[in-house]
C-alpha cells in the first residue's frame, strides 16, 4: 500500500481502486475529494466513493479487499436509511475510505457522466458537477448546502440545468425546494432559466 502516514486517505483510495478495477466495479468519487475537483478546497481526513454494485456483490468485493490486505467494516442501512450499505476501509495510520452503495434517489447514469482527473499518475473518476450538487442538496446539512453553492460559483461553465432539475426530482421534494432556494439566491446568471417546472 502507498500510505506511509495519516492524512493519506486519497492514497488508500488509489490502492483500493486497483481492486475495484480488477473486480470490474465502476465507481464515482464523491465528498471532499470531489469538492476539490469542483473548485472547493477543504481539509478532509477520509475519502468517499459511490460504487455501482449491488449489496450482495459487495460481500465478494469485501473479501477481495481483505485478501489484498485492507481492513474493512461493512455496515448495512435499514429501510429508513438513505444509504443501503457502507464498506469502510482503514489502514494502520487511520486513513479511511467509505465505499457507498445504493443511495436513495441516486441516478445510476451518474457513473457514465463521471469526469476523469489524474491523481498520483492515475486517472480517477469523479462525480460530475450536476450529480455533486444534487447529492449535496439531498444531504442537506449546512456544509453540504455551502458546497453546492460554492461548486456552482466555481464552475467554469454553467451546469446543465435540465439535468440538475431532473436529478433533484429523483431525490425528492425537499431536494427540489433546496435547489429552487439555491438558484433563487444564486448571484451568477445561469443559462436555461431558474424555474423548476
Feature names for model-found ranges:
Residues 1-197:
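Compositionally biased terminal segments of proteins
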